[in-house]
């Protein structure tokens, strides 16, 4: 499962946590690397190219949950 697929399991109309917030933001971003399973690629994208700001420490926590899923 890609990180994008994992995030899409957390999408919701009302933000209930950080994963939901990131999922909703990524869903609206057509350039997000949807096929990636690579931490560095996604982290770099969020840091340098994403059209939104998201705290990378929170991303690290969500990534750890992704790895455990």
From Swiss-Prot:
InterPro entries: UPF0346, YozE_SAM-like, YozE_SAM-like_sf
Matches recorded under HAMAP family: UPF0346
Family membership: Belongs to the UPF0346 family.
Protein name per the record: UPF0346 protein YuiB
Provenance organism: Lactococcus lactis subsp. lactis (strain IL1403)
């Amino acid at each position: 499962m890609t990180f994008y697929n994992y995030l899409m399991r957390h999408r919701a109309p009302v933000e209930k946590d950080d994963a939901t917030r990131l999922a909703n933001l990524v869903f609206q971003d057509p350039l997000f690397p949807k096929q990636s399973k690579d931490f560095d690629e996604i982290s770099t994208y969020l840091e340098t190219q994403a059209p939104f700001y998201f705290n990378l420490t929170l991303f690290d926590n969500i990534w750890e949950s992704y790895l455990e899923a």
